[in-house]
Amino acid sequence: MAKVQYYGTGRRKKSIARVRLVPGEGKVLINKRDEEEYFGLETLRVIVNQPLVLTGTKDKFDVLVNVYGGGLTGQAGAIRHGISRALLKADESLRPELKKAGFLTRDPRMKERKKYGLKKARRAPQFSKR
């Protein structure tokens, strides 16, 4: 018999997370590593688990994640987005609370490009009057 799996793709800045929810006891594996090992900071682990805690499904699913690109904070946001989308496929009735918390919204903020004549996106070279 085929196992029931729910897929979701999440994005944040330059990070892309492919999330798979499998019925289980609440383990989170990120790139084949435990979440404590992958994310050193507690705040990042909290971000990843927010949709599961909010919907009360923390102990119902094992979360298997492939994530690449960007930094750790962007990856945590992408995983949260992906888990939220996968939870919707598992149970559509969770949509109102996930939407109210803002977990289904793709954060549109991206890094601003560097402009020529400037040191960074907006930082101008030091101005000297004389």
UniProtKB/Swiss-Prot annotation:
Any single biological process term in GO: translation
Q: Where is the composition biased (Basic residues)?
A: 111-130
Under SUPFAM superfamilies, the record lists: Ribosomal protein S5 domain 2-like
- Give the UniProt entry's GO cellular component terms: cytosolic small ribosomal subunit
This protein's UniProt keywords: Ribonucleoprotein, Ribosomal protein
Instruction: Locate the compositionally biased regions of type Basic and acidic residues.
Output: 101-110
Q: Which NCBIfam families match?
A: PRK00132.1
| PANTHER family registered for this protein in UniProt | RIBOSOMAL PROTEIN S9, SMALL RIBOSOMAL SUBUNIT PROTEIN US9M
Family according to the record: Belongs to the universal ribosomal protein uS9 family.
Designated name of the protein: Small ribosomal subunit protein uS9
According to its UniProt entry, this protein's organism is Clostridium tetani (strain Massachusetts / E88)
